[in-house]
């Protein structure tokens, strides 16, 4: 998977929707400021620029998490700008790799994914907007929700949740883990695997 390599680097201040971003990071499992910082790709000190009252020693309730997301939403554009600047190099590396592998609009390709929401593929499409104008097609075995935009089209074998879906994902997980970034070796961009 390329969630770590595409989601944060794809953030554009003018298009960023914080509430949607958090929705795809399991907000019901957020219990600390540290987790909020991790989701946003920030350190605790960086998070304090937007939430000066952060305390690392308390557990957050679900209503408090929603309140914090609301406070961050009021600063959405500034936060997105900060994240975008922080991840600019990773964005350039991802775009270089994707351009190397896919090229321009003459290339025909599709992505295949086991289980997902389509959100990471939306992020991929956002990364590719400067060099690829056609919608990106992704085929999912199971699509939990349907996130499409003008830049991506998702197809699903099972269009909703199926029993034992998480077991299927465990059995099919890549042994090398997620793609966490990209690096250039001998003038060739390659994935850095986690």
Question: PLM ranges: what are they?
Answer:
Residues 1-40:
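Long, charge-dense
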Residues 9, 15, 31, 35-36, ...:
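Long, contiguous domain-sized segments
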